[in-house]
Curated annotation (Swiss-Prot):
Species per Swiss-Prot/TrEMBL record: Saccharomyces cerevisiae (strain ATCC 204508 / S288c) (Baker's yeast)
InterPro entries: ARM-like, ARM-type_fold, Deoxyhypusine_hydroxylase, PBS_lyase_HEAT
Obligatory cofactor(s): Fe(2+)
Stated name of the protein: Deoxyhypusine hydroxylase
Predominant place of localization: cytoplasm
Result when mutating E113A: Abolishes iron-binding, substrate-binding, and enzyme activity
Assigned keywords, A-Z: Acetylation, Cytoplasm, Hypusine biosynthesis, Iron, Metal-binding, Monooxygenase, Nucleus, Oxidoreductase, Phosphoprotein, Repeat
Length: 325
């Protein structure tokens, strides 16, 4: 999961046509830097979200975004594309996401993100494919993501969503699981215990995670950091994602430690790099630079884009829109 780039790259789409944005996203020129491709992606997302008022343009934006799945070599970009499609709330994206989730030629990190996006869309028509992948996919992260997506769709449409009293979140993202409801009145130690209990359903552990995120204190951050000891790579990558959302320097030491784990799954390390870029505190620069030649593509690319984010956060630029090239 990856939303922490969006707040840095989203700009008004008036500067480019949809076709120009598509050409930037798919790197038609062969010369477009990765950061500009992300900028184009999030601009197209803005259009795709307007399906209620501009259905034809929104559908075209979905189609243009989906072109990235065809021949692109950047696993990082494709997984971000899947994430973005899920966040649009536009069900026109569901058929493409189902295809990507089931396509064994796509990288597991991309297929996992496609499954998560189907959960974010709340697409009931995807339940059969999600159940199939949850049982049969060869990669555990994809199976676990399908389990979460199934639970989220059932929570959305089964009545629980309307009955629970959830804290008003500071974050606009549609997450893999909702936070635990306020009526649970759990303390931070209790939430930490649930977070780290492998006997509990993954969906419930995620709910504890997002409740801790919404609390957002240093104590909650330290509780979340204990989740980096979990066995599940999917779970650990979500902890890193949450830290990027919170944006607190208190999370930096644990993120640096996780990024440095050479034996760790790439999806975890890359998410830690993104989170460090989103936090954008001065001490992260040298750390990110030290991984610019990392042997893992998604880690290296995440550091490149994270440093671009840092430069923007610490510049006086007022405009950060893509340019056609």
């Amino acid at each position: 999961m990856s939303t922490n780039f969006e707040k840095h790259f989203q700009e008004n789409v008036d500067e480019c046509t949809l076709e120009q944005l598509r050409d930037i996203l798919v790197n038609k020129s062969g010369k477009t830097v990765l950061a500009n491709r992300f900028r184009a992606l999030f601009n197209l997302k803005t259009v795709a979200e307007e399906f209620a008022t501009k259905p034809e343009e929104a559908k075209k934006a979905i189609e243009y975004i989906a072109e990235s799945f065809v021949n692109d070599k950047s696993e990082l970009l494709k997984h971000e594309v899947a994430y973005v499609l899920g966040q649009t709330k536009n069900l026109d994206a569901a058929p493409t996401l189902r295809h990507v989730m089931l396509d064994q030629n796509q990288e597991p990190m991309v297929r996992h993100e496609a499954a998560e996006a189907l959960g974010a869309l709340g697409d009931k028509d995807s339940l059969d494919d999600l159940n199939k992948a949850a049982k049969e996919d060869p990669h555990v992260a994809v199976r676990e993501t399908c389990e979460l997506a199934i639970n989220r769709i059932n929570w959305t449409h089964g009545g629980a969503k309307d009955k629970e009293n959830l804290q008003q979140s500071l974050y606009s993202s549609i997450d893999p699981a909702p936070p635990l409801p306020l009526e649970k009145d759990a303390t931070i130690p209790e939430l930490q215990a649930l977070l780290n209990d492998p006997k509990q359903p993954l969906f419930q552990r995620y709910r504890a995670m997002f409740r801790l995120r919404d609390i957002g204190t240093d104590e909650a951050i330290l509780a979340l950091a204990t989740g980096f000891s979990a066995e599940s790579s999917l779970f650990k990558h979500e902890i890193a994602y949450v830290f990027g959302q919170i944006g607190s320097p208190a999370a930096v030491p644990s993120l640096i430690e996780v990024l440095g784990r050479k034996e760790e799954a790439p999806m975890v390390r890359h998410e830690a790099a993104e989170a460090l870029g989103a936090i954008a505190s001065p001490e992260v620069v040298d750390v990110l630079k030290s991984y610019l030649n990392d042997e893992v593509d998604v880690v290296r690319e995440s550091c490149i884009v994270a440093l671009d984010m840092y430069d923007y956060e610490n510049s006086n630029e007022l405009e950060y829109a893509p340019t056609a090239n």
